[in-house]
């Protein structure tokens, strides 16, 4: 185990201005590639989902790499400068309720802690190199890495081989997951289903589906209602000419503030001049599903007039960058969102962590923010 060195401490930052108030920065850190390690094992990084294990108090990250597919356990010391200490990896393995198809397609993207121990996670769906389809699922994992089962969304999410004319887009499916106070799981697509319309671009954001999964005594977990959520357009930033591959603005994680109120984390990836880091515009929105229509019976959304989930901006992370250390100059690829410990004034807080894609040019960054 190696405790990681951190970036220099950020200076205090005033609360970001947004409609009806926003989030306040409490602490931050950014770790260059290779500075978070665990002995001779796989490099720590690629964190795409984050949850606090209530039994140990440790933090658990879903690693977006499938060789091997694993969870990363860590300690986080909270303050103006956050300190992340990797502890161990837990490799996932099949339990009696896990199908061979589920195990073959594991590529974790988001993570939530479940009552009584264990986790739920999403695997977003993709085509492998031989065009074998691995469908998007929510999977259930014990603390020791045992995969105990999975549930899939409705049939209109199903991917197709060959022409790819229906369902989840390759590697752009169930990217986010949260658990509501009433016990439902809510997941969201990173980009629209193929039949629902175009991906985000610089003039219009894509229309993605949010879907609930409900635990029913007789049938286990089943898909339920769906809502339509409008993404923001991909940002236009001087000096960054085009999106990264699949880097248009998308939904990367979500967090339930209540049964119908959720925080949504949107981010994009923009390419700069050759040899320079990519730029990651990141925004957090508060949304409400109250009054939004259930679209679960609609196989396609393109061209329809719909009552959408309502949203309002609570933080544009770009407003924080000028007062953070130089390592933050082009933002970070934030994909993980979880509740943090109580803040200095007893307020609720959230913790963001970025996915460095296990690349030498990217960082693992963390932000600790107070809710208003």
Which residue ranges define each predicted feature?
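Sequence/structural signature of beta-propeller domains
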Residues: 5-372
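Sec-dependent bacterial lipoprotein signal peptides
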Residues: 1-3
């Amino acid at each position: 185990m190696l405790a990681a060195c951190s970036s220099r401490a950020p200076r205090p930052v005033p609360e970001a201005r947004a409609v009806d108030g926003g989030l306040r920065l409490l602490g931050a850190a950014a770790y260059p590639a290779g500075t978070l390690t665990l002995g001779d094992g796989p490099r720590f990084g690629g964190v795409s989902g984050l949850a606090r294990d209530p039994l140990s108090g440790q933090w658990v990250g879903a690693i977006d790499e499938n060789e091997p597919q694993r969870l990363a356990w860590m300690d986080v010391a909270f303050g103006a400068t956050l300190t992340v200490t990797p502890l161990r990896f837990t490799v996932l393995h099949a339990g009696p309720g896990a199908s061979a198809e589920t195990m073959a397609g594991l590529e974790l993207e988001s993570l939530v802690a479940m009552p009584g121990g264990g986790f739920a996670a999403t695997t977003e769906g993709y085509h492998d190199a031989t065009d074998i389809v691995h469908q998007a699922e929510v999977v259930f994992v014990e603390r020791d890495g045992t995969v105990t089962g999975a549930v899939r969304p409705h049939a209109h999410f199903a991917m197709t081989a060959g022409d790819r004319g229906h369902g989840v887009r390759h590697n752009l499916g169930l990217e986010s997951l949260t658990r509501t106070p009433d016990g439902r799981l809510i997941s969201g697509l990173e980009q629209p289903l193929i039949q629902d319309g175009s991906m985000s671009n610089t003039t219009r954001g894509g229309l993605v589906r949010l879907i609930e999964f409900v635990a029913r005594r007789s049938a286990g977990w089943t898909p339920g209602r769906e809502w339509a959520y409008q993404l923001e357009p991909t940002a236009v930033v001087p000096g960054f000419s085009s999106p990264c591959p699949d880097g248009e603005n998308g939904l990367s994680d979500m967090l339930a503030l209540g049964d119908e109120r959720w925080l949504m984390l949107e981010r994009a990836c923009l390419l700069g001049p050759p040899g320079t880091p990519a730029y990651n515009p990141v925004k957090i929105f508060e949304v409400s599903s109250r009054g939004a229509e259930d679209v679960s019976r609609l196989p396609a959304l393109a061209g329809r007039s719909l009552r959408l989930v309502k949203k309002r901006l609570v933080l544009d992370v770009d407003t924080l960058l000028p007062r953070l250390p130089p390592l933050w100059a082009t933002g970070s690829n934030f994909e993980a969102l979880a509740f943090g410990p109580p803040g200095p004034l007893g307020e609720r807080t959230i913790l963001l962590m970025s996915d460095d894609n296990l690349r030498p040019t990217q960082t693992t960054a963390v932000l600790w923010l107070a809710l208003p």
